[in-house]
Amino acid sequence: MAKTIRRYSSFRLRNRRIRSRKSARKIPKGIIHVQASFSNTIVTVTDVGGRVVTSASAGACGFKGRRRGTPFAAQTTAENAIRTVVTQGMHRAVVLVKGVGRGRDAALRAILRSGVRLHLLRDRTPLPHNGCRPPKRRRT
């Protein structure tokens, strides 16, 4: 005869305390990834193992259209991402920058002003060895 599978009641699952796992972690060291394209800037903060702690983009911070690629949007994006992880105890970080957008320097300045000590700063911009054909010049 087959054993019956015991199921928990939905009442028990509903009254469980809800708490975010990401805010409970303490992360003293981390990696800040800055991806600066011509149209947007994305800042992702991970722990040393590579698990994402938080991320922010210029579009998610309220900038729309052309303003997403501006240095001010990149600065605001970096400040929002860093503010979250500083409250979780991060005080040392490695910064990896990728892309050639206008916001990369502004995002880096915002990270330096935040009080997080930089252990390493590395440029990870992919350089083609004459790969894909670039988009044509814009005529205005």
From Swiss-Prot:
One of its GO terms (cellular component) is chloroplast. Gene3D superfamilies: Ribosomal protein S11 (3.30.420.80). The gene is rps11. PANTHER family: 40S RIBOSOMAL PROTEIN S14/30S RIBOSOMAL PROTEIN S11. This is Small ribosomal subunit protein uS11c. It is found in: Plastid, Chloroplast. Its main location: plastid. The lineage of its organism: Eukaryota, Viridiplantae, Streptophyta, Embryophyta, Tracheophyta. Keywords: Chloroplast, Plastid, Ribonucleoprotein, Ribosomal protein, RNA-binding, rRNA-binding. Belongs to the universal ribosomal protein uS11 family. Part of the 30S ribosomal subunit.
